């Protein structure tokens, strides 16, 4: 094979697989930053919707640190934290009445699937998608809350 053809072939392989290689090598997490719930674009079933929620993702030596703060529909505070990796293993959540562990796995550069557990039992699943322009984060969640009430929510967040 001549040198030009080989160079073109290597370039094509890198162009098509480069994203996967960068992702596997620990590319920057596109969720990093502060995200505010857009109530007008979100749907909470059966509801009611929270009054406000802010999610902050930060990179740390231990993985991705997530802090969630807000105000529930009844006026009570929402505040929980977790530090996790996208490796499918369970990581502790502190402060949530609904979950005590979280496991997450990347589907692709913009999508993550997560499972939430309480006392070792799966109580929720979430798909997190970040828009192509990186300014909208959507969480599609199904599961049961601490009272056993089923929910099917789509929460849309705007990057700040």
What are these language model-derived features?
Residues 1-12:
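Bacterial N-terminal signal peptides that target proteins for export
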Residues 4, 23-160:
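Hydrophobic small-molecule pocket/channel-lining residues, especially in calycin-type beta-barrels
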Residues 9-11, 20, 134:
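Generic secretory/membrane-interface signal
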Residues 15-23:
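C-terminal segment of classical bacterial N-terminal signal peptides
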């Amino acid at each position: 094979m001549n040198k030009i053809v080989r160079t073109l072939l290597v370039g094509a392989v890198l162009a098509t697989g480069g994203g996967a290689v960068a992702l596997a090598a620990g590319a920057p997490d596109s969720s990093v930053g502060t995200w505010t719930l857009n109530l007008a674009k979100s749907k909470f079933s059966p509801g009611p919707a929270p009054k406000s929620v802010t999610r902050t993702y930060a990179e740390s030596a231990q993985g991705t640190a997530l802090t969630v703060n807000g105000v529930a529909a009844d006026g009570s505070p929402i505040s929980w934290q977790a530090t996790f990796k996208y490796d499918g293993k369970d990581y502790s959540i502190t402060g949530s009445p609904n979950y005590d562990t979280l496991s997450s796995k990347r589907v692709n550069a913009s999508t993550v699937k997560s499972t939430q557990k309480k006392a070792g039992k799966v109580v929720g699943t979430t798909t997190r998608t970040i828009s192509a322009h990186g300014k909208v984060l959507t969480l599609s969640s199904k599961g049961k809350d601490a009272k056993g009430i089923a929910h099917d929510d789509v929460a849309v967040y705007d990057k700040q």
